Amino acid sequence: MSPKTETKASVGFKAGVKDYRLTYYTPEYQTKDTDILAAFRVTPQPGVPPEEAGAAVAAESSTGTWTTVWTDGLTSLDRYKGRCYDIEPVPGEETQFIAYVAYPLDLFEEGSVTNLFTSIVGNVFGFKALRALRLEDLRIPPSYSKTFQGPPHGIQVERDKLNKYGRPLLGCTIKPKLGLSAKNYGRAVYECLRGGLDFTKDDENVNSQPFMRWRDRFVFCAEALNKAQAETGEIKGHYLNATAGTCEEMMKRAIFARELGVPIVMHDYLTGGFTANTSLAHYCRDNGLLLHIHRAMHAVIDRQRNHGMHFRVLAKALRMSGGDHIHAGTVVGKLEGERDVTLGFVDLLRDDFIEKDRSRGIYFTQDWVSMPGVLPVASGGIHVWHMPALTEIFGDDSVLQFGGGTLGHPWGNAPGAVANRVALEACVQARNEGRDLAREGNEVIREACKWSPELAAACEIWKEIKFEFDVIDRL
């Protein structure tokens, strides 16, 4: 290159490495109604100031890189950069703090959770200057949430489709989760639905394995629910898992489910991916299918307190991507879930407007501007003795799902379903009469046992079953 045309480092911009905080830490910034706001729990490496660590998060999740580049001069960084606008300590943690970051809306593609997460929870989580990083919450402005379809139908439309009101819905995951033939699987579905459940469910890892191919399962399950509907006079459903190795195969399964006339399909939204999930949600709305969502893999992402992403963020992402149900823990069962934290993200799933409430882990006020709500599903290690607590904790707009708590009944699947239905209706009646389920719940169940031998047998077999471990994710 001739000396006349050689680009000098001193011409046009000043090369080198600058502290992130000089550009991306802006405590004077006033957030806009259109900004996407994030609350990160940051654990910097020793010697890294909080302001520099917070600014690094803002930079690396938006426009920044490790050095100054000449193409910075071709755009407006002030318009597009993320900004760390506040830092606060974490009580009881000397090495951690909460960094609040504001992102301008133009950084993100409309209607794409995939693009949103690629920026905000992308490479920045491997940044060497940070020992750990956790995304605690996101504020999604109406100007962005309105670019999403959201749930295919929502809570009220689902109740209208099922013609079921005034109580939680009852479900059951078919067990053993793997190994049954399609015909035996369909038989278990029929027995549970005939006994009084509203739904049965494929487990998350039931896809199309050698022992039971998906098409055979779909056909036998459709036959089972049609037979149960005819006998009970109630609308029934089975969550047919459409999750597959490719989006094309997933859609093929959803289309076949619709052709069978079933009311609901299922997807593993984290292992399947947000792009696939959003596509399936759009298909379900267009074709009248409800969509049940399983959160398999969530604990890999959300269980550790100092690194990853809290489930409340995954819950918001699912509401935008689309789903009518999602598993949300139980508080009282075998899976992780502290009560206040769980109820915080349950409200974020169901309600239209949720106020900031740090006592429940909600860092920002969230306005969903009439986006349909999602039914939380309580599932995992629950049985009839848990029914009063579940009814009191989750209320009517929920699905209470008993797998082993139905199929483990000593008299069989149908009596197990009867026991759960009787226990639920007893709890709902007691609550409606003004009784305190938190205090009188066990007595309500014992009274119901007097006129339901199925419930009495269930109470006897599970009277000693408890899962008493401290939760990891506390506020």
Swiss-Prot record:
Entry PTM: The disulfide bond which can form in the large chain dimeric partners within the hexadecamer appears to be associated with oxidative stress and protein turnover.
BP GO terms, sorted: photorespiration; reductive pentose-phosphate cycle
Cofactor: how and how many bound: Binds 1 Mg(2+) ion per subunit.
GO molecular function: magnesium ion binding; monooxygenase activity; ribulose-bisphosphate carboxylase activity
GO cellular component terms given for this protein: chloroplast
Residue numbers bearing the N6,N6,N6-trimethyllysine modification: 14
Protein name: Ribulose bisphosphate carboxylase large chain
Lineage: Eukaryota, Viridiplantae, Streptophyta, Embryophyta, Tracheophyta
